[in-house]
């Protein structure tokens, strides 16, 4: 008797691409907007100064009347807000997860972006010496000595913390990706790749509107998308290959409400903050 060929693994239903793009654009904009303005800009005001520029991917504070400690606190406020976003989102996913796949994926994406930004900045500042945890006057580790040692510590801690964030995010999403083996890994990889590419296009596109030129695109807009969220490019390889999950699993459905919200947020953020506000 000739053995019958093995049946091909069942394929998860495809997520709606337009809705994934909208969810992703909204998540990236909310993550960076809260980091910059609920974090840096608000801290600048609360600590006795005022922002001189409110950009899409940066906030400049008038440091002339602030002590070095307060300047460090302004720098620290952005990563603290990003960390808080991530913690709140992942606690929500554990305690009261949204029933709809669209809402679940948005909260997961926003939380992952928040934690990636908080830990990624440690690595970025350690490698470059600039940014929120940098050793320049507007960084948390200004005048830290010896500078090279602090930067090595930041780099190592940032890399380790970033990897832990990736593991946490994958572990949270793992039970929701339908299928088995390579099929579910490929599905998850394509899903988050679509989100990553959306974030890159939106971030760089809006970043190009800034009045300071390509330097802002390189160190702020591109760094927050290409760099901080680069874990999306490889994280789904960590999914449990042996874990079967009943189909359909997490499938993003077409939703014109999410599409309209994502488009509106992108346009408004680009118009208001892209060219930079000078209050």
Which ranges hold each PLM region?
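Short, Lys/Arg-rich, polar N-terminal cytosolic tail immediately upstream
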Residues: 1-15
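Small-residue-rich helix-interface/hinge motifs
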Residues: 15-16, 23-73
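Metalloprotease/metallohydrolase-associated module, dominated by Zn2+-dependent proteases
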Residues: 53, 61-170, 188-200, 228-234
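Short alpha-helical packing/oligomerization segments
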Residues: 68, 208-231
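Membrane-interface helix-boundary motifs at transmembrane edges
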Residues: 94-104, 174-184, 244-250
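Transmembrane alpha-helical segments of integral membrane proteins
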Residues: 229-245
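Interfacial loop-to-transmembrane junctions
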Residues: 240-263
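Juxtamembrane boundary at the C-terminal end of a transmembrane helix
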Residues: 267-279
């Amino acid at each position: 008797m000739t053995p019958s060929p093995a049946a091909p693994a069942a394929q998860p239903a495809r997520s709606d691409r337009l809705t994934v793009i909208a969810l992703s654009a909204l998540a990236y904009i909310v993550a960076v907007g809260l980091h910059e303005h609920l974090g840096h800009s608000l801290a600048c005001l609360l600590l006795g100064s005022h922002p001189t520029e409110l950009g899409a991917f940066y906030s400049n504070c008038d440091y002339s009347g602030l002590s070095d400690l307060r300047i460090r606190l302004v720098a620290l406020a952005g990563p603290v807000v990003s960390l808080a976003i991530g913690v709140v989102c992942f606690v929500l996913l554990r305690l009261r997860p949204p029933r709809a796949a669209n809402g679940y994926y948005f909260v997961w994406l926003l939380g992952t972006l928040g934690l990636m930004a908080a830990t990624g900045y440690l690595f970025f500042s350690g490698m470059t010496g600039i940014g929120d945890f940098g050793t320049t006057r507007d960084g948390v580790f200004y005048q830290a000595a010896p500078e090279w040692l602090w930067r090595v510590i930041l780099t190592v801690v940032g890399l380790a913390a970033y990897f832990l964030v990736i593991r946490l995010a994958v572990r949270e999403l793992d039970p929701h990706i339908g299928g088995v083996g390579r099929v579910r890994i490929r599905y998850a990889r394509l899903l988050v790749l679509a989100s990553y590419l959306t974030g890159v296009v939106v971030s760089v596109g809006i970043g190009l509107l800034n009045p300071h030129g390509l330097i802002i695109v390189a160190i702020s807009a591109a760094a927050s998308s290409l760099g901080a969220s680069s874990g999306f490019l490889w994280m789904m390889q960590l999914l449990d290959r042996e874990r079967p999950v009943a189909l359909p699993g997490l499938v993003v459905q077409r939703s014109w409400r999410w599409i309209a919200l994502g488009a509106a947020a992108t346009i408004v953020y680009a118009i208001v903050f892209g060219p930079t506000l000078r209050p």
